[in-house]
Curated annotation (Swiss-Prot):
Family listed: Belongs to the bacterial ribosomal protein bS6 family.
Organism: Clostridium botulinum (strain Langeland / NCTC 10281 / Type F)
Gene Ontology molecular function, alphabetical: small ribosomal subunit rRNA binding; structural constituent of ribosome
Protein name per UniProt: Small ribosomal subunit protein bS6
PANTHER family xrefs: MITOCHONDRIAL 28S RIBOSOMAL PROTEIN S6, SMALL RIBOSOMAL SUBUNIT PROTEIN BS6M
Role summary: Binds together with bS18 to 16S ribosomal RNA.
Length: 94
């Protein structure tokens, strides 16, 4: 098991409940694959440095989790097919 960190930005058109529902969805993906979520930090709505997909702000979330080496690939796939995700990044913690 390795430690990972992911940051993702969600579309600002979501309401607060939709934002939290998406965060819970991604937590569920991690937990259903046998991983554990160590920390979730909801940064809220912030301005982007530049426009992405014609959007200038988004909901930022930082999530730390522990999982096997295959889970980040699955989580990346889920991020890519979820329309509300503007940008995401998954890194391995040292």
């Amino acid at each position: 098991m390795r430690k990972y960190e992911t940051v993702f930005i969600l579309n600002p058109a979501l309401d607060e409940e939709g934002y939290k529902a998406n965060v819970e969805k991604f937590k569920g993906v991690i937990e259903n694959a046998g991983g554990t979520v160590d920390n979730v930090d909801l940064w809220g709505k912030r301005k982007l440095a530049y426009e992405v997909k014609k959007v200038s702000e988004g909901y930022y979330t930082l999530m730390n989790f522990t999982a096997d080496t295959e889970l980040p690939k699955e989580l990346d796939r889920v991020f890519r097919i979820t329309d509300t995700v503007i940008r995401h990044m998954i890194i391995t913690q040292e």
